[in-house]
Every structure is written in structure tokens, then in C-alpha cells.
Amino acid sequence: MAKEKPHVNIVFIGHVDHGKSTTIGRLLFDTANIPENIIKKFEEMGEKGKSFKFAWVMDRLKEERERGITIDVAHTKFETPHRYITIIDAPGHRDFVKNMITGASQADAAVLVVAATDGVMPQTKEHAFLARTLGIGHIIVAINKMDMVDYDEKKFKQVSEQVKKLLMMLGYKDFPIIPISAWEGDNVVKKSDKMPWYNGPTLIEALDQIPEPPKPTDKPLRIPIQDVYSIKGVGTVPVGRVETGVLRVGDVVIFEPASTIFHKPIQGEVKSIEMHHEPMQEALPGDNIGFNVRGVGKNDIKRGDVAGHTNNPPTVVRPKDTFKAQIIVLNHPTAITIGYTPVLHAHTLQVAVRFEQLLAKLDPRTGNVVEENPQFIKTGDSAIVVLRPTKPMVIEPVKEIPQMGRFAIRDMGQTVAAGMVISIQKAE
């Protein structure tokens, strides 16, 4: 059997109106991956004889968005010669940040769309910081709307310089910068003849070269539980995605914070593992599995628990413990002060956490401290804070298990901040 092409998850980021949706639309249109329902609508409208026009498709997608149905960009797939690519989300979605952190899919790469007409705008910066905070290691830059600047090389160079400065400051290296016109279809899938001065890859060629994400099999086993089922003749079956490590039939696993909450080890031997209804002997990172554990009942575990090996159990932070985190405030109506208690979302858990200390305000670009012990932090600020959970929860320092160390903070139906765990302080 030939080795399957690697699967790569990408997100589209960038300032509002710089053409993220159009770029996604063009990728799908030119690779013949337009959503079924749109094609159906086209046929129903008796437009059979006419050629399927890009503008028409974009209007339909726009209508759907305005009716609150974002093209399920939420999971749009297409293929390149060497990759299966899934577009997992595009901002503008209210839950974009939360999805990026708690979504079943962590993004492997981001496409940053910047309009040649505007250059770097506030949201361009914010999304780039966010990509960094969320640990997205690979970025591709698409300078869009080249048709509106007459495909001018000078304009392209000028905007490229701004973007380069921003991304290098954030620690990104080796990122392609591609001049495109999503609307006209230049350099997205088809090479443009309007920019003879450019000889780099098209957007789809750059996507085809995204490095394959390494599977973190060498890290401790962590499986955040999404659901728990009772299956007749099998017993209790927790379901979740292996984030790190390897699970094998016969392993002994323990669940946290369940064990901490019940004051006794909720653990047992793994009797069977299944993926897509097929039994398997071992599960690797990225696998969505159901598994059965001897002696663990339906009421012992729930969504938000995490399975790990007994010799390296998941890290529990209790209400008497605290953890230090670096956050970026994305959207808070006033200011965050000590005592603020919103809800933290990480992997599959949701727990209210209290802001215990505001240690430092950082320059989001350099990470340097600009103010010690600030009185408050507000939208746009990056900060080091100390948080205390209101009930036991599992989270890991991002340096040790990055997949388990990122979180979103939500309140009033929106994502207030995104962050990562620096260290955990256990009370004796």
C-alpha cells in the first residue's frame, strides 16, 4: 500500500475585507471543490447552459454567510499533488479563536491574506500575533487584490516589506509571499501571466509544500475525552482524539481530574480500541478513537477528563493551585482586573478561572515587559497573569506538551482572550 499523502490543516487569517473568503472561494472553484449545495442551486436556477461563473458562486457564498451559514468553511477539503488539505476555519466566525484552540483540529499552517491596496492593518497584526500564540509554525502570505494596483511590482514589494517586518518580529522565518488576485484568479491555482516579474510559487503550490506536521508520539499520552458512551456487550467507551503519545491495547490508563475529584484512581487496562468502527491495536496522535477500559464506569468520567498512562498521569490544577500564563486580550468591553472570573476553554474542558494576579504587561511584538503589576489590562494587550481554577482541571505547560497548554477565555458569548500556560504552581 502506498503511503497516504499527509493531511494538513490550514486556517485563513487577515484583516476584514482583505479577501479571505474570496481566496478560499477561488481555491475551491479552480480545484472544482465548490460545496454541493451551491452547485445544486445553480442547476435549479436553470442556468445549466451558462458557464458556472466565479462571481455567481461568490454571491451565493456571501448570501449564505449573511444568513449566518458560513460556508461550512468549517471543514472544506481539497487535494494538491502531495497533500490533503483541510481549511478548518476562517475568522469573522465569532468562535474562530475558540475553534482554533479547542477545535478537534489544531492548524498546521496559516495563510495570511493582506490586500495590496491597504497593506498591514490592525487585524493583520492581531491575527499574526494570534497565530504565534497558538503555536502555528508555518505561514504563507498572499498579497491579494493585485488587480486593483495594476499588478504593480513596486506596490507588491512595498507591502511585502511591511509584512516581512511584522512576521520576522514574531519569529517567523522562510515564509513565501505570493502576489495574487483571488477575484481574477491570478496565482491562486493558475499561474498568472500578468506579473512576469514574479517567478515564485502560486498559492496552491505553496500549500503543496507545507511541511508535514510531526506526530508527537514521543510525548506523554494525552487523550482529552469528548464523550462517554455505554455500549451493550462492551461497556463504557470514552471517545476522544489522541493529542500526544501512543495508546496500545493492554496499557493501563488513568483519568484526570476524575481521580482527583473522586479521591481514588479512576484507572484500568485498555481492553480494546476502535477507529471508524475498525478495531486497532494502537492509536497515534490525530486519531479519533473510542476505547474501553476495564473497571471504569459511565459515571466515573465525563467530557473534559483526560486519559494518560499511570506512570505519567495528566497534570491536574486544583482550586488551591494556580498557573502562570501568557495571554493576549482580543475583545473585552472594558478592562480586566484582579478577581475577574470568566470561563477557560482548553481541549475539551470548560472551567471558570479567576484572575489572581496581573504580573506584567508585554509589548505584543517583542514580548518585552512594558509595565510590571499593571492595575488592569484591556483589548490589544499582551500580559503575564496568574489564574486559579474554580474546580480541578487538566492543563499542561506549553513547553512540555504544547497541544495541551493553549486555551481560550470566554465571557458574554465571546472570546475575550487567548493564551498559553507557562508554569503550574502546586500548593502543598
UniProtKB/Swiss-Prot annotation:
Record-annotated tr-type G domain positions: 5-215
Keyword Magnesium (UniProt): yes
Gene Ontology annotations for the cellular component aspect, listed alphabetically: cytoplasm
Region span, G3: 89-92
GO molecular function terms listed in the Swiss-Prot or TrEMBL record: GTP binding; GTPase activity; translation elongation factor activity
Intracellular or extracellular location(s): Cytoplasm
InterPro entries: EFTu-like_2, G_TR_CS, GTP-eEF1A_C, P-loop_NTPase, Small_GTP-bd, T_Tr_GTP-bd_dom, TRAFAC_GTPase_members, Transl_B-barrel_sf
Domain of life according to the entry: Archaea
Name used for this protein in its record: Elongation factor 1-alpha
Species in which this protein is naturally found: Thermococcus onnurineus (strain NA1)
